Amino acid sequence: MTTLTLDEIERQREFNYRRTPERRVRTLEEARAFIEEVDFCHFWPIKGIELPNLFHAIAGRVRPVPMEHDDPDISKCWGWKDRALDKKWWYYGKLLRRRATLVSLAELPYFYALSENYGSLDDYLQEYADGLMTAEAKAIYEALLEHGPLDTIRLRREARMSAQSAKSRFDRALVELQVGLKVLPIGVAEAGAWRYAFLYELLPRWFPDIPEQARQISRAEARRVLVLRYLDNVVAADRKMIGKMFHVLKRTPAELDRTIDVLLQKDAVREMQVEGMKGLQLVSTHAMGRDL
């Protein structure tokens, strides 16, 4: 059996995540290529979560996120993201771990196939009737449904949550809608005290082809594709980390186990000890085939 070490895995992650001076992301076009390479990543590094992120790819190394807004890596990260919002190059919104996530359009149908959506703009009514959507999320969704794209300030007003006392409820509901792949930011407006506010729209209107593409994908296939893509990027992870990574997709432990079992049967992944890592790790055989 092939023996792997944590050092070998970390070297491959440095390459995959573009955390090297040679592969660092230097332009907006390279940022777009990076998202298409990894298919999904976080915007920022998230403590305790193994996943590529755009900030480290721009920095070309692991570094703390600085507080200074004039830091060159921070400026590129924010600026390129804002410039790309209306380009329809990728999905950007709160998703994995309920944090800012970028997803390639090639991979987005697989995430959508695991959501509660079927592609109709009125799907939300059944979710609300079933108790799967909060009243605040319903109000925000209906404001966008009626008025089209709205900046955050006007969206709060149209959803009748403009009072300061309603801000936390509004923010939670907006994250709920993004995690549910119903709403996403599509631009930036000069609104509010800071003259900066996201412009939001309904995902099926912004990406009308995604629901139809997702209809061709079973939930089981979607889980297999996403878990395997994740392992191709991170090289190795245990079952607990995979569960944490995809917790918002509402899979049961049994569904995750079945997904992993199929990947093991296909020899797409192998479960093994890795020197320097605790417990059994699921390792991508595609990654193992590279020059680790």
Language-model region placement:
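Long, low-complexity intrinsically disordered regions
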Residues: 1-292
